[in-house]
């Protein structure tokens, strides 16, 4: 309660006694005031006892028992704010009981959502960046493995025969050709003969057998067969044979054929050639056969020679 309320004309109940406080002094703390003479510095609301305040009051009686807690009164009107009073001495009264907890207040309604702000303007477009440096050329990739050969396709079916073309018109008969010059005659002959031996060295037991020849124009082809015996480790041997057809153009420097022995012979041919004699038309066999002992051999000689025209 404020001081202005305390010192306004009001009626207070003190120990079931009523007293109207009127015309209170402006300075209730003065010690010369009769009303406060026995209770200096103690406002009336702190005094206790059964003495009627109108008779001056007696001394304070004994402190009675603490009464029951009264019901909470309604709030009085708020008085005007008085001037600050002097600070009282600290009281030593007992601490009052803790009041009941008040009920929770009602929850306020949710406020409405605020308005959405306007969209900002678009920012300025930045400058284009400079082109990056060109990268180095990469290494060549590894060469791939060769692919497998493809499977050969099936053989196609034979095509149909093409259409026969139309017969062309008959051509114009050409003029008769000029008569040619008379041709030369060509000698054609062949036969068998048994060559004769006109000279020999190293070889012994020479026995020529039936041989063959053929002539086409100026060329004579021949084949001679003969048996002979050679000594062990022979040197080069020679046999002269007569020709089947005479020729006037023999030259000893010309090789006209070769010679060999049959497979049944045990010797080894080191060489065998045929040449021609210049002095007397004949076929010359020059041959060397290697053998560790004297053996008989069968010799085959083939060749060609030329017959001049005339």
Curated annotation (Swiss-Prot):
Residues 1-183 are annotated as: Disordered. Keywords: Glycoprotein, Repeat. The keyword Ribonucleoprotein does not apply. InterPro entries: Collagen (IPR008160), Collagen_superfamily (IPR050149). One of its GO terms (biological process) is extracellular matrix organization. Glycans are attached at residues 227, 264. The keyword Glycoprotein applies. Residues 92-101 have a biased composition (Basic and acidic residues). Residues 61-119, 123-182 form the Collagen-like domain. It holds the Pfam family Collagen. Residues 1-41 have a biased composition (Polar residues). GO terms for molecular function: extracellular matrix structural constituent conferring tensile strength. GO terms for cellular component: extracellular space. Belongs to the sputnik virus V6 family. This is Collagen-like protein V6. The lineage of its organism: Viruses, Varidnaviria, Bamfordvirae, Preplasmiviricota, Maveriviricetes.
């Amino acid at each position: 309660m404020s001081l202005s309320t305390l010192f306004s004309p009001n009626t207070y109940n003190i120990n079931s006694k009523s007293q109207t406080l009127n015309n209170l002094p402006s300075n209730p703390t003065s010690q010369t005031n009769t009303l406060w003479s026995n209770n200096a510095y103690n406002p009336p609301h702190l005094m206790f006892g059964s003495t009627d305040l109108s008779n001056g009051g007696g001394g304070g009686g004994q402190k009675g028992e603490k009464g029951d807690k009264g019901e909470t009164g309604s709030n009085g009107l708020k008085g005007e704010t008085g001037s600050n009073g002097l600070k009282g001495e600290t009281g030593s009264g007992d601490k009052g009981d803790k009041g009941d907890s008040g009920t929770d207040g009602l929850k306020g309604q949710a406020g409405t959502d605020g308005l959405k702000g306007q969209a900002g303007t678009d920012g300025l477009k930045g400058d284009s960046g400079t082109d990056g440096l060109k990268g180095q050329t990469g290494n060549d990739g590894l060469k791939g493995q060769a692919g497998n050969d493809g499977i050969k396709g099936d053989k196609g079916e034979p095509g149909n025969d093409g259409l026969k073309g139309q017969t062309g018109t008959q051509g114009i008969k050409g003029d008769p050709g000029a008569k040619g010059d008379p041709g030369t005659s060509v000698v054609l002959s062949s036969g068998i003969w048994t060559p004769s031996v006109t000279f020999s060295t190293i070889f012994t037991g020479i026995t020529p057998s039936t041989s063959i020849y053929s002539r086409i124009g100026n060329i004579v082809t021949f084949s001679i067969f003969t048996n002979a015996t050679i000594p062990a480790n022979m040197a080069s041997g020679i046999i002269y044979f007569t020709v089947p057809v005479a020729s006037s153009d023999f030259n000893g420097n010309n090789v006209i054929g070769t010679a060999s022995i049959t497979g049944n012979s045990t010797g080894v041919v080191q060489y065998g050639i045929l040449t021609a004699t210049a002095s007397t038309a004949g076929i010359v066999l020059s041959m060397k056969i290697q053998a560790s002992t004297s053996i008989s051999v069968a010799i085959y000689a083939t060749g060609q020679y030329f017959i001049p025209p005339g």
